[in-house]
């Protein structure tokens, strides 16, 4: 029970009666701050929302054992929830993934209570709703479940959230854990207070910063970014040329302000003094900030080919919102179809080919089959055929001899001449020749790998640099190269999901790494791509390579799962139209429970393996 007395508003005195489980008053608490959490009666400071109980309608046989789930209808409403059976009890959560809204009932659930999204592998805790693996950043709302004597299940629901919407509606079914835990303005301001600086404004940076606050870290957090925007959903750039920050931002600037996360926008870090723990920006001779812990999350920068003419005004890159805006503008101008030449048959290059397929699109690549190194000859050939069905022309096993500029405008490319003599007309040229790690600001302070990345340990600590971590595209991390054998190999993975998970790894070690017996939580690298069909992939072919591919399903119908093997071990899995196979395999890798190559050749169903 709560009584509040207001004296000369807005000052007030708050009294709280403390009760035991039998509702007997045990004492009186005097507090100076307004309460934020709902009381036992369900009353809230704003809206006086009332908790209600709703019966669930579902098929009992669908949740008869641990590791099962179903979509349950909330009787008396138009909504549903995900009902999970795990750890010999029932859990109810929001039914859609907080990443892109995938139906979680079509994903997978483990017997110990992990919910995995069928589309992109985001993982949630069934009991708490907390995010355990990215790409999701918002937690699921959970609902207490009670079982009545007649076997019926009921959930307890607070009918309104702080925004006045039903918590069962899509806009109300997710939670932001960090703002629930951290109170704005509680950051420590002493000179000796801890200060985590993060260089880079991508997914790894955003996840690391938010995770620190989610665990109630009260030191300073500062993010340095070259861009003038908060971190945003970069994969959408190549999948749609979306360039509206309001639709791309992972979080609003106000959200970061509420977490006391500071930004240096439009800022280029040029030097780091590792000995003195100081960061220098631009041409400044004085350090901009000092840090106690540093996370490097600067990602990659596009490769530029040393060919005259590729600096023409109609040659475009795609790495930022500004790039997407320029490319969207030039490809939607009124007029006839444009001749668009994409240099590079990478995932991003061919995602752009899908977006621009209404134009005359040509793709130049050095390999004989797109994606062969990662996906194998069979899958690469099938994807190439799919693009050709959409009118995309390929010029493979080729390279650029020269770029011919317009006779009317020497600053504009007009034709791309290939080494075999073919000439391709070009109104728009897109350079999609991959990226390289952006670590110039380190100078010679740290030894780099051959490809320009930096080596880290299992906690993302940079080897040879005290209190420095690296995540994302720049980090050579010890991923599971052969997951089923437990072996590990350092490799650099340029995946959005990996960047986010490494950000969590680094932040977690900053907070808890000094505790006895500390270990880093494992995750399986997960990747997706829009290639005219939705392609999912998990594993790590890049670390160890593969020597065979087991195909289940039909490549020609684009409904298949492919298992990449080395010997009898599976090192990676991809699928199209076979959800949730890849999400299931992501968990099987973690549990060291993947079937063998021989089993898969006998058409063994990985979905039959209990998690």
From Swiss-Prot:
InterPro entries: FAD-oxidoreductase/Apoptosis (IPR050446), FAD/NAD-bd_sf (IPR036188), FAD/NAD-binding_dom (IPR023753), FAD/NAD-linked_Rdtase_dimer_sf (IPR016156), Reductase_C (IPR028202), Rieske_2Fe-2S (IPR017941), Rieske_2Fe-2S_sf (IPR036922). Keywords: 2Fe-2S, Apoptosis, FAD, Flavoprotein, Iron, Iron-sulfur, Membrane, Metal-binding, Mitochondrion, Mitochondrion outer membrane, Nucleus, Oxidoreductase. GO terms for cellular component: cytoplasm; cytosol; mitochondrial inner membrane; mitochondrial outer membrane; nucleus. CDD domains: Rieske_AIFL_N. Binds 1 [2Fe-2S] cluster. One of its GO terms (biological process) is mitochondrial disulfide relay system. It is found in: Mitochondrion outer membrane; Nucleus. GO terms for molecular function: 2 iron, 2 sulfur cluster binding; metal ion binding; oxidoreductase activity, acting on a sulfur group of donors, NAD(P) as acceptor; oxidoreductase activity, acting on NAD(P)H. Putative FAD-dependent oxidoreductase involved in the resistance to cercosporin and other singlet oxygen-generating photosensitizers. Translocates from mitochondria to the nucleus under apoptotic conditions, where it degrades DNA and induces apoptosis. PANTHER family: APOPTOSIS-INDUCING FACTOR 1, RIESKE DOMAIN-CONTAINING PROTEIN-RELATED. This is Apoptosis-inducing factor 1. It comes from Schizosaccharomyces pombe (strain 972 / ATCC 24843) (Fission yeast). The lineage of its organism: Eukaryota, Fungi, Dikarya, Ascomycota, Taphrinomycotina.
């Amino acid at each position: 029970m709560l009584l509040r007395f207001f004296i000369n508003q807005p000052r007030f005195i708050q009294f709280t009666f403390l009760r035991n489980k039998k509702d007997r008053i045990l004492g009186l608490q005097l507090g100076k701050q307004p309460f934020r959490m709902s009381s036992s009666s369900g009353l809230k400071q704003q809206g006086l929302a009332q908790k209600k109980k709703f019966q669930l309608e579902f098929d009992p046989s669908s949740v008869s054992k641990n590791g099962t789930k179903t979509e349950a209808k909330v009787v008396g409403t138009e909504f549903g929830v995900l009902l999970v059976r795990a750890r010999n009890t029932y859990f109810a959560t929001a039914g859609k993934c907080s990443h892109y809204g995938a139906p979680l009932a079509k994903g997978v659930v483990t017997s110990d209570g992990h919910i995995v999204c069928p589309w992109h592998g985001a993982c949630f805790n069934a009991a708490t709703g907390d995010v355990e693996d990215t790409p999701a950043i918002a937690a699921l709302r959970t609902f207490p479940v009670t079982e009545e004597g007649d076997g019926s299940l009921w959930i307890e629901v607070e009918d309104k959230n702080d925004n006045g919407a039903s918590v069962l509606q899509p806009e109300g079914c997710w939670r932001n854990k960090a703002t629930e835990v951290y109170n704005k303005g509680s950051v420590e301001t002493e000179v000796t207070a801890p200060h985590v600086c993060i260089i880079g404004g991508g997914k790894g940076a955003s996840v690391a910063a938010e995770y620190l606050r989610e665990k109630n870290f009260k030191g300073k957090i500062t993010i340095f970014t070259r861009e003038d925007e908060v971190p945003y959903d970069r994969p959408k750039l190549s999948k749609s040329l979306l360039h509206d920050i309001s639709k791309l931002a992972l979080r609003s600037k106000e959200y970061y302000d509420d977490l006391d996360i500071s930004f240096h926008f439009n800022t280029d870090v040029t030097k780091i003094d590792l000995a003195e723990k100081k960061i220098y920006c631009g041409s400044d001779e004085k350090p901009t900030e000092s840090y106690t812990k540093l996370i490097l999350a600067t990602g990659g920068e596009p490769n530029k080919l040393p060919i005259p003419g590729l600096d023409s005004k109609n040659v475009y890159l795609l790495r930022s919102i500004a790039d997407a805006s320029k490319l969207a503008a030039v490809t939607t101008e009124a007029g006839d179809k444009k001749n668009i030449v994409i240099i590079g048959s990478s995932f991003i290059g061919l995602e752009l080919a899908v977006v621009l397929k209404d134009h005359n699109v040509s793709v130049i690549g050095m390999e004989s089959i797109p994606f062969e190194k990662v996906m194998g000859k069979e899958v690469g050939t099938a994807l190439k055929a799919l693009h050709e069905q959409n009118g995309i022309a390929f010029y493979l096993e080729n390279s650029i001899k020269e770029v011919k500029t317009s006779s009317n405008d020497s600053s504009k490319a007009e034709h791309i001449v290939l080494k075999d003599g073919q000439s391709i007309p070009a109104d728009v040229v897109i350079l999609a020749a991959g990226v390289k790690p952006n670590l110039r600001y380190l100078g010679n302070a740290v030894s780099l790998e051959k490809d320009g990345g930096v080596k880290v340990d299992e906690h993302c600590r940079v080897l040879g640099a005290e209190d420095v971590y690296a995540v994302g595209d720049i980090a050579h991390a010890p991923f599971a190269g052969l997951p089923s054998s437990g072996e590990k190999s350092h490799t650099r993975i340029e995946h959005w999901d990996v960047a986010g998970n490494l950000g969590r790894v680094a932040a977690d070690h900053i907070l808890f790494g000094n505790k006895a017996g500390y270990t880093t939580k494992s995750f399986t690298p997960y990747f997706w791509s829009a290639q005219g069909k939705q392609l999912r992939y998990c594993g790590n072919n890049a670390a160890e390579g593969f020597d065979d591919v087991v195909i289940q399903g039909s490549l020609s119908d684009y409904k298949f799962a492919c298992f990449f093997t080395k010997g009898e071990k599976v090192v990676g899995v991809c699928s199209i139209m076979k959800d949730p196979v890849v999400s299931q395999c992501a968990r099987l890798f973690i549990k060291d429970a993947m079937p063998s190559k021989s089993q898969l050749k006998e058409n063994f169903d990985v979905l039959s393996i209990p998690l």
